[in-house]
């Protein structure tokens, strides 16, 4: 492939990224990392991928602990997080962790998004532990996440913006550190979102996967979206999400042991418990949610 060519140079790298940006997609951070991974020794990718696989559950646990206001060394949090990830469908885990392109665009960007949120969570839930030096890793992580996957960029920017507004409402002051990270995230996401290649890629994807897409009504779009969300939960992501919900239950129980009298804890624990049970329904032979979205081709008949 062109990426592996021994004649590739820094000039060609810029040409390659420019070609991808103009003709296919705006995911420049992911494309650049893929380029470097293919041009380097395979062990570079293996080491970084292993690091990302470790940092993903660690980051999720840290965010959950900050949100719950609990610091714990309970091993069950780690077991729930890691097991939920590694027990996902073999194809899903393979695409996200073992396949080079997939790991870079999905696992790496998701991990970077999680770690970009660490200082945001500190400012919102645990201000005294926020350190400005966190920006040295958070901002690069925000750039990678928001310039690798559209959904991650949108979610990250939304959470950062909500944090800015919340801190102003609560403290009547603006955190310039958070504003800086939010501005960088917005700029990186704009670079991705405004890529000329996006329109070409969308046209190609529509032709290949759903030719009737342009003629769908708003209701049909909404129906498909709901079906795919449920299908994604009930098939690919059920155990990963179940692991996260179990972490939430464990942390809220610990908070209650520490003397918390917040009645909403019981409500959130109840919701998390319900979703955890629902995620296990396919193992009991109940596939009503797993089957949703599987035969979406006849959407025009709805």
Where are these regions (language model features)?
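Perimembrane helix-loop-helix junctions
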Residues: 155-186
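Membrane-interface alpha helices of multi-pass inner-membrane proteins
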Residues: 133-156, 161
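Single conserved hydrophobic/aromatic residue that forms the stacking wall/gate
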Residues: 1-8, 12
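Short hydrophobic/aromatic helix or loop-helix immediately within or flanking a transmembrane segment
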Residues: 19-43, 47-50
């Amino acid at each position: 492939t062109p990426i592996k060519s021994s004649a590739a140079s820094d000039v060609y790298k810029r040409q390659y990224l420019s070609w991808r940006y103009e003709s296919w997609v705006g995911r420049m951070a992911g494309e650049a990392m893929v380029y470097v991974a293919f041009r380097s020794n395979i062990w570079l990718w293996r080491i970084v991928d292993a690091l990302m696989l470790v940092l993903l559950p660690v980051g999720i646990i840290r965010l959950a602990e900050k949100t719950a206001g609990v610091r714990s060394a309970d091993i069950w949090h780690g077991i729930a997080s890691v097991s939920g990830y590694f027990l996902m469908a073999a194809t899903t885990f393979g695409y996200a962790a073992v396949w080079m392109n997939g790991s870079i665009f999905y696992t790496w960007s998701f991990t970077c998004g999680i770690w970009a949120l660490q200082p945001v969570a500190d400012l919102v839930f645990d201000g005294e532990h926020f350190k400005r030096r966190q920006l040295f890793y958070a901002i690069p992580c925000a750039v990678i996440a928001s310039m690798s996957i559209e959904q991650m960029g949108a979610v990250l920017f939304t959470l950062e913006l909500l944090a800015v507004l919340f801190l102003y409402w609560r403290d009547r002051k603006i955190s310039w550190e958070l504003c800086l990270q939010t501005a960088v995230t917005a700029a990186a996401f704009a670079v991705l979102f405004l890529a000329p290649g996006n329109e070409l890629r969308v046209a190609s994807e529509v032709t290949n996967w759903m030719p009737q897409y342009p003629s769908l009504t708003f209701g049909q779009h909404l129906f498909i979206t709901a079906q795919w969300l449920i299908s994604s939960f009930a098939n690919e992501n059920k155990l990963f999400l179940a692991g996260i919900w179990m972490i939430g239950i464990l942390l809220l129980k610990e908070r209650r042991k520490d003397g918390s009298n917040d009645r909403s804890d019981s409500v959130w624990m109840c919701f998390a418990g319900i979703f955890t049970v629902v995620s296990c329904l396919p193992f009991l032979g109940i596939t009503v949610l797993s089957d949703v979205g599987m035969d979406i081709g006849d959407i025009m008949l709805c």
